[in-house]
A protein has these predicted regions:
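N-terminal Rossmann-like FAD-binding beta1-loop-alpha1 element of flavoenzymes
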Residues: 3-31
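Conserved Rossmann-like nucleotide-cofactor binding loop
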Residues: 13, 37, 272
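Glycine-rich FAD pyrophosphate-binding loop
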Residues: 22-47
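Mid-domain catalytic core of redox enzymes
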Residues: 24, 241-250, 254-359, 373-377
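Conserved flavin/dinucleotide-binding core of flavoenzymes
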Residues: 44, 325-414
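Dinucleotide-binding Rossmann-like beta1-alpha1 core, especially the glycine-rich loop
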Residues: 48-138
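General small-molecule cofactor/ligand-binding pocket signal
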Residues: 81-83, 235-239, 352-354, 384
Length: 414
């Protein structure tokens, strides 16, 4: 079997790239997906009568009009609802005036530092004092270690109460294995702006991603990817994974023995999930340095008394790090689902749970150099990494689609 473009993975990256080629009149491609259905981390299943997104919480951010217009070709805009994000943090804090040391549960909107005004004044005062003393506000040099950097950036109290425990739950037990290079985009937490926010009783600063988002009216987020997969007809192979890539001859061998020769191989799958034949030892060693986490998505059938779309839980006394309140964005549904790093997950009898072996690429200290080396080697062999796993970067689906569209524009002229 031969194709000019052999596309590995039928998630948002692979599906977008393939459909862009098709839309340009290029039909010399084939897509390989190991699962029986396409969508990758954005797949949905019907659970308790309604869709559940089995790869976590995925929504279509409105900020990239070109991406939205592209996806609306497969699932028209009138089939989506548009929401203003309501995300919150549930945190247990000891009231400063308490003599017992017992914690009390508080809820505030995300991001934490922009919504301190929602807490009691005694808590506001504590956080304001901590922010004023933060290293980034006092000319102290930027620390090298992750935990020290978080404290330097946000102040010791936000770090201790929220950022450090939450990131520990979501990413790694030893946070100092993570680098700090990916945190530089976070704005400084200004004492003056935080104080003014508390006085005016409103959030300050720019809002996080998905401030406004689309979600299907009648389906899960996986529906749009299913429709994109259907457009590919016999150019899509499902239900069989990739065993190896012959980097010298650009031959992909599938687990069932099928061999596909390509002029270009577009890989959207994790690098450590496939054998790279003819790759030198230093490349294989670099791949071993690319780390990731697994998650378990578990459905809970009870309705919660909240308007939030999702809620973050930094408390180390519970396994999961966030919940997605399905009933607030999926019309006619009930309940919610939890997202838990698999290392922390403790299955209970009767759990309805889905495990994603590859959920989040980790921004470890060694990652930038390692992935750069892998991608450089691969590209010289006409193997191109694309998307969350091909580039080993924590891209949301809209970013992945955007990158796939741009790559297709570039490759169409090759």
């Amino acid at each position: 079997m031969k194709a000019k473009y052999v596309i590995l993975g039928g998630g948002p990256a692979g599906l977008t790239f393939a459909n862009c080629l098709k839309n340009k009149g290029i039909n010399d491609y084939i897509v390989v997906e190991k699962e029986s259905t396409v969508g990758g981390l954005c797949r949905s299943e019907i659970v308790d009568g309604s869709p559940l997104d089995i790869g976590g919480g995925h929504f279509l951010d409105v900020r990239r009009p070109r991406v939205c217009e592209f996806l609306f070709k497969y699932m028209p805009e009138e089939e989506w609802d548009r929401y203003s994000r309501d995300s919150r943090i549930s945190v247990d804090l000891v009231p400063p005036e308490s003599s017992s040391g017992k914690t009390k549960k508080y809820e505030l909107h995300h991001p934490f530092e922009a919504n301190i005004w929602e807490l009691p004044k005694s808590q506001q005062k504590r956080y304001l004092e901590s922010i004023a003393a933060a290293g980034c506000n006092n000319g102290e040099p930027k620390p090298a270690k992750f935990v020290d950097w978080i404290t330097w950036k946000l102040g010791k109290d936000i770090a201790k109460d929220y950022m450090i425990p939450y990131n520990t739950k979501m990413f790694a037990s030893n946070l100092n294995e993570l680098g700090t290079y990916w945190l530089d985009k976070l704005p400084n937490v200004s004492y003056e702006e935080t104080l003014e926010s508390c006085k005016q009783k409103k959030a300050y600063g720019s809002q996080p991603g998905h401030t406004e988002f689309y979600y299907p009216k009648k389906f899960g987020y996986g529906e749009v990817w299913l429709r994109m997969g259907a457009e590919l007809s016999d150019k899509l192979i499902t239900g069989v994974g990739v065993k190896s890539i012959d980097c010298m001859n650009r031959i992909v061998t599938l687990l069932d023995g099928t061999k596909i020769e390509g002029e270009y191989i577009i890989s959207t799958i994790p690098w450590d999930s496939v054998e790279l034949e003819w790759a030198p030892t230093k490349i294989k060693d670099s791949i071993k340095k690319l780390k990731s986490t697994s998650i378990n998505i578990t459905y809970i059938g009870e309705n919660l008394n909240t308007d939030a779309h999702w809620i973050y839980y930094p408390g180390l006394d519970i396994d999961y790090h966030r919940i997605l309140v399905r009933s607030n964005f999926c019309p006619g549904s009930k309940g919610y689902w939890t997202e838990t790093r698999s290392e922390r997950y403790h299955e209970k009898e009767g759990d309805i749970t889905f495990k994603m072996d590859y959920a989040y690429p980790l921004n470890t200290i060694q990652k930038p150099e390692a992935i750069a080396r892998v991608l450089d080697f691969a590209q010289k062999s006409h193997i191109i990494g694309l998307g969350r796993w091909g580039e080993h970067n924590h891209y949301n689906s809209d970013v992945t689609v955007d990158r796939a569209m741009k790559l297709a524009d570039k490759m169409a002229g090759v």
